[in-house]
Amino acid sequence: MKIHVVVLSALVSWAPFVVAQEPAAAPDQESVQNVGPVRVFLDCRTRCDFDFIRQEIPYVAWVRDRQDAQVHLLITRQQTGAGGRENTLAFIGLQDMASVSDTLLQVSSPTDTDSEEREKLTRTIALGLIPYVARTPQAAGLDVSWTEPTEFELEAVEESDPWNSWIFRLRTSGSLGGEERTKDYSISTSVSANRTTEDVKTEIWTYGRYAESSFELSDGSTTTGLRRDYGASLLQVWSLGDHWSIGGETSAGHSLYGNYDLRAWIAPALEFSVWPYIEATRRQLTFLYALGVQHSDYIEMTIFGETQETRPAHSLFAGLSMNEPWGNATVGLEAFQYLHDPERHRLELFGRMNVRLFRGLDFNVSGHFARVKDQINLRAGEATDEEILLRQRELGTDFRYGFSFGLSYRFGSIFNNAVNPRFEALD
């Protein structure tokens, strides 16, 4: 059976846009032909349909561990300005294929279905594997063909954008549930308008949420819990080159839980990226500083005797994220401080990491810790037991923390080509 890899024209607006960032090294005369199919380790850091990929690309050997692979395929994702997704596919040659490495981009439309997304991603994977398959006996059964775009498709690409890159989203959701002595319901909605180009990013967001839960107690009385939040925000960012950005954020909102009848915040900000922004899908180290003013109208008097106040504040955020063959890691440190009283501050450290320690052994850890000294919004008076149990009001604390870890070990056959969907309901 011949395997055909069909390359659709990049001019077709609904087809995946594929760009080779680092051209693959050309096969040299000293390359040794493999006696079997190329062994590929699929390392997908986003949403991938593994079964579909294995079914559509059967002419390589899919292995479960990087140590057994000749090709490490690392896939990462980021969102595009139009609301679609840009997948970065890094083909990393190993062992006798170490001289062949490449990076491809695949872009999907925000209107693509899950089926269309997986087909486009799988097609791009097949394209990227061609230089490796060409060095094996499987190349004899591989044809590469090109489908010429129609006149209609060419005209569609040249058509101007009447929306000028603006994307609008309307969302609403609700839930209802209960038992004999409990019931709850909630409704939420949001409206957003985003525009993203290489030089400017604008994000406008409005939201609202209402949730209510009621419980019948043993004495026949009923306790009700209520959550109500709504607000709006604007983020504006301008590019200052490959490493710098300038912008600002303004927001206003209401929070019953946080004791805010109105909380308004405005702050200009400056960000520096150690590595060029174009490398963000693989590695990113950024520092962001913001200086602003917060105005608060409180629902109830605070523990400091305030019903409203306006305070200057500043914040600093440092974040590192990496997606590498050994695994991925994200670490962030955020500091916030009110300038009228430096003792009112918050310092938070968080991170997560997934690491392949050695063949078959994976380790993951995540956690966060915060020193909390900035709760100027707390209601005066003691919280009742009902308010504590139902989380009806923000409680005073000096710290918050959380930690989790996991360890997994796999062993056995190195191959992973078979697909068997039977009895999945019991799997």
Descriptions of predicted regions:
Residues 166-170, 202-204, 246-250, 266, ...:
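Transmembrane beta-strands of outer-membrane beta-barrel proteins
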Residues 174-178, 197-199, 208-214, 250-256, ...:
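Transmembrane beta-strands of outer-membrane beta-barrel pores
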Residues 158-165, 198-201, 239-243, 258, ...:
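Short loop/turn motifs that connect adjacent beta-strands in outer-membrane beta-barrel proteins
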Residues 170-172, 189-195, 234-238, 268-274, ...:
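Residues on the lipid-exposed face of transmembrane beta-strands in outer-membrane beta-barrel proteins
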Residues 164-166, 183-187, 226-230, 262-266, ...:
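Residues that define the transmembrane beta-barrel architecture of outer-membrane proteins
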Residues 35-40, 158-178, 199-204, 285-293:
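Transmembrane beta-strand segments of Gram-negative outer membrane beta-barrel proteins
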Residues 181-186, 215-221, 259-266, 297-305, ...:
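Outer-membrane beta-barrel translocator domains and adjoining extracellular loop/strand segments
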